[in-house]
Amino acid sequence: MKRRDIKSTSLLLMVLLVLIVTACGKNTDITTTTVKEEPKTESGDEMKGYDFSTFENVEITGIDMDSLTDEERSILYVQAKYCQAMTDADIDTMRELVSEDMIYTHMSGMQQTREEYFSDISDGSLRYYTIGIADPIIEVDQAKARITYTSVLNANAYGSRGTYRMKGTHHYEKSDGLWILVNR
């Protein structure tokens, strides 16, 4: 190899090294980077039979899952299951989770019965892609519960595609051992 080629190769390697180091950021120590393995305990996504990782289109943020009681966790799980069913347009699952007399109020103020709302999801008038459950606050009082959170909806609502952030509350009642979404 010629001396000129060696200098060019050395210069190129130095430039690449500088790019790699600076790409890691000012405060990153690349010599101590480790990979942390997820714990195999009942913490994180899978706790006491509640496997939140199965909800591919639902992201839950702003809550310490380890601090939840079993009842609070079950409410959050049902809410996530409902949101996943919305993104899958799984009307059968939604029917299982929602009372028959449910009335939906859209951010526009438009109100719909359960079946009208489900019909719009089924025919694609309402299409949910992902749903975030941000900063949920869960309150349980025996057979009644509510969850207040900010929805982060990536959706196409009647031809208007976008990401919509809305704060709201869902109310639940326990019926035959199952939590059902109800009107207030």
Locations of regions flagged by a protein language model:
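Bacterial N-terminal signal peptides that target proteins for export
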Residues: 2-11
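Hydrophobic helical h-region of N-terminal Sec-dependent signal peptides
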Residues: 13-18
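C-terminal motif of bacterial Sec signal peptides marking the signal peptidase cleavage site
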Residues: 20-23
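Short, low-complexity N-terminal intrinsically disordered segments enriched in polar/charged residues
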Residues: 25-92, 96
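Hydrophobic pocket/interface hotspot
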Residues: 82, 94, 102, 117, ...
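Short solvent-exposed beta->alpha transition segments
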Residues: 95-132
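Surface-exposed, charged secondary-structure patches
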Residues: 118-160
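Exposed beta-sheet edge and beta->alpha loop/turn motif
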Residues: 143-183
